[in-house]
């Protein structure tokens, strides 16, 4: 069919109004131009084709957005298209953040004994922005009742919400409760959650005030579970943005039935199911928040969960990120952090490690709760490392033992070695305070082997029963002066600027089911640890021999 311009058709551009005498639009790409003013259509056209009817999008009187709706980018377009150029909104609340404590100093200031770098207020400010508020961080308020009262009084007259950090417990210089009582009213002091129990909820000059505990993890959970809801409430909405997955617990968790407890976990996706491995639970362990992939909430009425229980975990990452995570449960070493960093640099996959000791790693491998385990287990009968333990604990599964590094274990002591400790015998002779690794760790097994060989009774060592879960934690206790010696790897001593007395060389290896060697994430991890970049980082740390790195031994 041929059409003549001005008779059968007119030319319009996208978005133009259609003249009343026309009722169909044919796209230019569906036409054959016979001449400058004549076209031929190549397929049938029907009435109202390619025409947007008046009222198809928005008509007068139509509800565009309901009350208490959070305006999204797409909503702005709908409002303007509907002729609505102004709307009444809830204002973003102005939030005053007041850090308190004589012991606090600003980042970058010179530190003296007893000083603590103040960082909670900066975390709060970022969280408040994320929740939709406008944060203002005050200068550190020292532990002076009158001065703190004046600061809080002024803030309550200028801001919508006040966050008072630290001083919510019952110590001699914990003034938060007294200040709030003097200026206003305390509704609640202490709630049944852990961490975060000492929180204070009150009002000053009819403004809500929250006294937040000083411990970083406690503070984080109060912000997430109370302050976030408060900021949402004053803005007229309640965002339920927690995302949950069902996961299997890799170990037993005990909890007090007095509190709702928040437990940080590592997550992995193994053989079609999610695995949750609990990590540090202390209220002051800031890195547990950084390292966590999710949070398990243990209800107040429960005393915990058994290993293997299916639980709901609030995830802090996307499910895709978790499914692209390689989970390592086993013995700790700093080189795992280096490998994790280099793997993340490549893009798709990440390495997530939980430190439970070598035996704990093998048991997780046996129960199909980890992709691989890092182990350094000495067979005291043969002097061989790792192979016999894999055979003993996992007899019915083909396991590959990947040679990782040989490393030096030794005594870590204060710089300058003030007690002149040169052997394990000196620990006993000089009454040195020892800090140990946990039962089931390869370092603990090595220590017990050496003590037995030397005829030393563990009961004669002061601190033998005092346990830490990583080499760096042992080194930190010595560096702080809380212990005189501990057994660990050279790299940990170097990082904490300690002296090091070598005791033994050991094999730190990777045990992995043979079928997992075909996983893309595992292949990329193996590429990382065999790379020159990784080996260069080992050289910088010192104390590692990687001459056999990457060699695979199949154990059946």
Please give the residue ranges for each predicted region:
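Short, glycine/charged-enriched hinge/interface segments at domain edges or termini
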Residues: 1-139, 275-280, 311-317
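Flexible glycine/proline-rich
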Residues: 58, 181-323
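Helix-rich terminal scaffold detector
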Residues: 87-212, 216-221, 342-347, 374-378, ...
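Short loop->beta-strand "edge-of-pocket" segments that line small-molecule binding or catalytic clefts
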Residues: 323-332, 424-445
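Ligand-binding cleft/hinge of the Venus flytrap
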Residues: 338-347, 424-425, 437-439, 443-466
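N-terminal segment of the mature folded domain
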Residues: 344-426
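A ligand-binding cleft/hinge motif common to bilobed small-molecule-binding domains
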Residues: 374-392, 475-504
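Periplasmic-binding protein-like
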Residues: 396-408, 498-527
């Amino acid at each position: 069919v041929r059409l003549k311009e001005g008779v059968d058709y007119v030319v319009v551009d996208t978005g133009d109004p259609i003249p009343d005498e026309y009722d169909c639009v044919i796209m230019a790409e569906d036409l054959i131009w016979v001449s400058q003013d004549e076209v031929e259509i190549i397929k049938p056209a029907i009435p109202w084709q390619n025409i947007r009817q008046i009222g198809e999008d928005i008509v007068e009187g139509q509800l565009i957005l309901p009350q208490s709706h959070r305006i999204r980018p797409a909503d702005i377009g709908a409002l303007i298209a509907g002729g609505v150029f102004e709307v009444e909104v809830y204002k973003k609340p102005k939030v005053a953040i007041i850090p308190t404590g004589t012991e606090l100093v600003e980042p970058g200031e010179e530190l003296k004994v007893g000083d603590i770098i103040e960082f909670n207020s900066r975390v709060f400010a970022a969280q408040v922005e994320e929740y939709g508020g406008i944060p203002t961080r005050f200068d550190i308020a020292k532990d002076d009742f009158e001065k703190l009262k004046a600061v809080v009084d002024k803030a309550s007259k200028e801001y919508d919400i006040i966050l008072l950090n630290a001083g919510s417990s019952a110590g001699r210089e914990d003034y938060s409760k007294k200040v709030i009582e003097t200026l206003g009213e305390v509704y609640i002091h202490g709630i049944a959650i852990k961490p975060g129990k000492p929180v204070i909820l009150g009002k000053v000059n009819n403004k809500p005030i929250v006294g937040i505990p000083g411990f970083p993890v406690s503070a984080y959970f109060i912000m997430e579970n109370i302050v976030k809801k408060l900021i949402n409430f004053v803005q007229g909405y309640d965002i339920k943005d927690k995302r949950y997955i069902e996961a299997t617990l890799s170990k037993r968790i005990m909890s007090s039935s007095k509190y709702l407890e928040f437990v940080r976990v590592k997550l992995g996706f193994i053989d079609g199911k999610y695995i949750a491995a609990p990590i540090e639970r202390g209220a002051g362990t800031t890195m547990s928040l950084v390292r966590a992939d999710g949070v398990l909430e243990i209800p107040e009425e429960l005393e915990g969960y058994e290993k293997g229980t299916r639980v709901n975990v609030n995830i802090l990452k996307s499910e895709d990120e978790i499914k692209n995570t390689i989970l390592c449960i086993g013995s700790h070493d700093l080189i795992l952090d280096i490998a994790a960093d280099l793997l993340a640099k490549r893009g798709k996959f990440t390495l997530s490690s939980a430190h439970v000791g070598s035996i704990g790693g093998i048991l997780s491998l046996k129960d199909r709760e980890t992709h691989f385990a890092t182990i350094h287990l000495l067979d005291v009968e043969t002097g061989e490392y790792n192979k016999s333990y894999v055979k003993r604990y996992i007899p019915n599964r083909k396991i590959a033992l990947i040679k990782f590094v040989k490393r030096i274990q030794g005594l870590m002591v204060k710089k300058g070695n003030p007690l002149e400790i040169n052997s394990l015998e000196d620990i006993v002779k000089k009454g040195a305070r020892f800090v140990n690794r946990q039962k089931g760790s390869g370092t603990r097994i090595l220590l017990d082997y050496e003590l037995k060989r030397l005829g030393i009774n563990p009961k004669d060592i002061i601190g033998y029963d005092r346990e830490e879960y990583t080499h760096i934690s042992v080194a930190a206790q010595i560096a702080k002066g809380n212990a005189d010696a501990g057994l660990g790897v050279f790299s940990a001593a170097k990082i904490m600027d300690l002296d090091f007395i070598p005791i033994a060389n050991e094999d730190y290896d990777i045990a992995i089911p043979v079928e997992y060697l075909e996983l893309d994430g595992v292949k990329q991890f193996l590429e990382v640890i065999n790379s020159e970049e990784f080996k260069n980082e080992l050289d910088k740390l010192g104390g590692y021999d990687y001459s056999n790195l990457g060699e695979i031994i199949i154990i059946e």
